């Protein structure tokens, strides 16, 4: 009997397209029906150690010191090598390497000067994680409280193309939350303030709608983005109120970890634990770190 993967290969589909095409309903395994679909993107801005990352034997992840932890999932894993981000345009390679990674779109012309001759602005398109989030949030069966979580570790305290990987759309960067204690509060904050927050959001949304009537078309478009953000926060509050008993208990974080560079390994572990816990409790099905 021909396997699903072999069947797709026989169709002449490239290896790079295989992970995407194999997830289509027509090619889905019966065993995967009903399973929750999730996507997590992890980005290492300083790269990796090639000699310890790439398996010496492509068919054995145990030959990679870094990937050996995935050995039990060898048959479900695929390691791709040789993919290059060739998006050109304004900005230096570091700016494009971050802001164009998930968008595949050039940076807008702007006034942020990097290490190249031409300054640049934000990415000109939506990132793939947000595209997936929007798709899942449209369906009642796959909708979650947050939709997606944008998490960071030691992200510089500034807003520019070097620090923004996720985009809700053209010129709409999403800031990652790099404080695990703030992330914990976002996920499991006490519900006693919910009514106060809801009241404030209701009032804010109403005021923004009134203001939009007297603005020019360009300003109305920008204000509409703010209105949509308020609406998203309202939906998150409603979902939080409806959430029942947690499948997995709220994680406990060491309260004595300072957010300093020397503690990056511990902070990264805390953020990963929070992301996994949120996924397990179905608060989101899309995450970036």
Show where each model-derived region lies:
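Ligand-binding pockets and gating/stacking loops
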Residues: 1-288
